[in-house]
Amino acid sequence: MVRTQMDRRSPITRLITIEVIGYLLILMTIALPLSSAGFGFDSANSCSPNGKISRRGRAQILAAIPCDLGQQAFCHLPGSAYPWHAVRRFVHENQGLMKRMYGDVRHISILRDEIQNNEVDADDIEETAERYSKDGGRRSAKYLMNNRDRDREREDFGSFKSNDVLMEPHFRPVSTITTSTTKATTTTTTAPEIVSSTTERVPNEVTDTTPGNTNSTISTTKGTAPPLHEKPESETDIVEIQPSPESNSVYEVVSPSVLSTTSTAKPSSAAGENIQIIDSPQLGLRNLSAEASPSQEPPTATTGKPTSVPKSTTPLPIRKRKPAETTTSAASPKVSSTISTPTTTTATLLIRRNVTKYSPASVTTPVSFASLFSGTSSGLFSPERLRRPLTTTSSTSAPASSPPAGGTPASSSTGSASKSGLLREGQLFQDAMKQEPVAVASNLRGVNACPVKDEVVAPFWANNTRGEVLALLNLYPFEQYVHWEKCTHEFKQMFCRDGCRCEQQYRLHRLLAYDPHNECRGIFSDWFRFPSSCICKCYNIPMEFRATSRSPRSDSRFDAPKSDPIEAAEAEVQRAIYEHATEEWYRPRDEFDFLED
């Protein structure tokens, strides 16, 4: 009896056990994927590792790229290996992100559009597949938008999902804007000669070499200068040439044959001492026109007096000025010359630079900046052009004998000018420029010392900073543009100074990229190195000047010309009014009582 009951229960127990085990297996198969999904998103499930692109090797992809990325860091052509499918999928799945990154679209508008148009219709999928399956020759905006009019007739067109982001790839060629350098032309205009003996706005500096070394300045203006007291020492007329500040040239060059003055020689009772005139220290360079050569004889002092048309008898005031830096050698041999009759004398006139008054005898010569420091003698800074003496011949009633055959200041200046150049030994280029001021006009247009090629490029392929070849996201209208200036003549001197050359500079950019060897990585951002600008780099600067920490040179003479004084005063008044108004507006009143009822 008992055995029979056990025999009956055993099949039932076996069935229950089998069913329980089956249910446990079903629960395990359902619970394992859920538990794995709870740890995070598996990127391997979102890509197709067995796809066509993943099976292609690195060599095949590099061969499919139309540019040699081993020679250059980018390629602006897509080629057949560009992953259009991954780029389109990323743009389609991140419409809000792309619109916020590339346009002025509010985030709430993007969210509203995504919520309302979150429907995925089979028609959209078929239309998109048909659109991108057509050949490239039939792709056009007119062909792609031919069904839009039919869709507008639908009642639910307002909520109809339109994939405007999925547009055709829009290729834009690389800009070929080149910066060409033009040769500056030189135009010279000569002012008419001044014939009259009375000159306006041109002061005559009378250097009086008395034993006390004092100088007096006589300003000649339409009047008769009374005769000064006769002195045994010599006197020389020095005309100060003053260029025009209103001209548009970089430098003002005064022609040596446009200004003439008339002077009358006066007999000298005794021979004067030998005088060596040295220019003022503020001019920077040495006075090349008045230095006497050691191999030549000392110059002969001449005596001259300024004359003018007798129109009035009002005496002109004489003001004392700080004596110039002069040296007198007392031990030098004296020149015994007694002039009994009026003779024709020659006075050496020095060109004074860095003056701001107007002179009708100035000649405007616009030249290029590079030609100013050329080593040839034909340049503007050649010693012959800089310190060429202006000679003025005084005409008298009767000719007489010439001065002694000794060396003259003109001959000595020519010898010294031919031996010394613009830059002294051990002198920096910036120091010479600081001593020799350049009157830069505001309306001149400069050129780059290193010519560049300006480009705006949206590359498809590029090498990142680790040397990996990546595809950049470049789908219209979400291209990633890079603007750079490339040297047209790299490692060449061009317009740089000696010892310098043009070199390309680079800059890092962070761009969205795609790795064709790892589709599971998706779209990510990486660093890329692209050209930025072209600079002029010098290598012959001494180490002592490199090591010293100096503030940057800022000379106001190289800056833009200052504004008119009246305009500057008006601007100062406006600024004072504005400061006063803001101070009264923002500052609380002192008499305000916070405890007032």
Swiss-Prot record:
Residues of the Spaetzle domain: 448-538
GO molecular function, one term: Toll binding
Skewed-composition ranges (Polar residues): 206-223, 290-315, 325-335
InterPro entries named in the record: Cystine-knot_cytokine, Spaetzle, Spz/Toll_ligand-like
UniProt xrefs under Pfam families: Spaetzle
Disulfide bond annotation, renumbered to this chain: C450-C502, C487-C534, C496-C536
Secretion signal span: 1-31
Induction per the UniProt record: Transiently down-regulated by microbial infection.
Record's keyword annotation contains Plastid: no
Annotated Low complexity bias: 179-199, 391-419
Glycan attachment points: N215, N287, N354, N463
The entry's keywords: Coiled coil, Disulfide bond, Glycoprotein, Immunity, Signal
One Gene Ontology term from the biological process aspect of the record: innate immune response
Coiled-coil ranges from the UniProt annotation: 107-135
Region Disordered, residue ranges: 179-235, 289-340, 390-419
Subunit structure: Homodimer; disulfide-linked.
Other observations noted: 'Spaetzle' means 'noodles' in German.
PANTHER family reported for this sequence: NEUROTROPHIN 1-RELATED (PTHR23199), PROTEIN SPAETZLE 4 (PTHR23199:SF5)
Protein name: Protein spaetzle 4
Lineage of source species: Eukaryota, Metazoa, Ecdysozoa, Arthropoda, Hexapoda
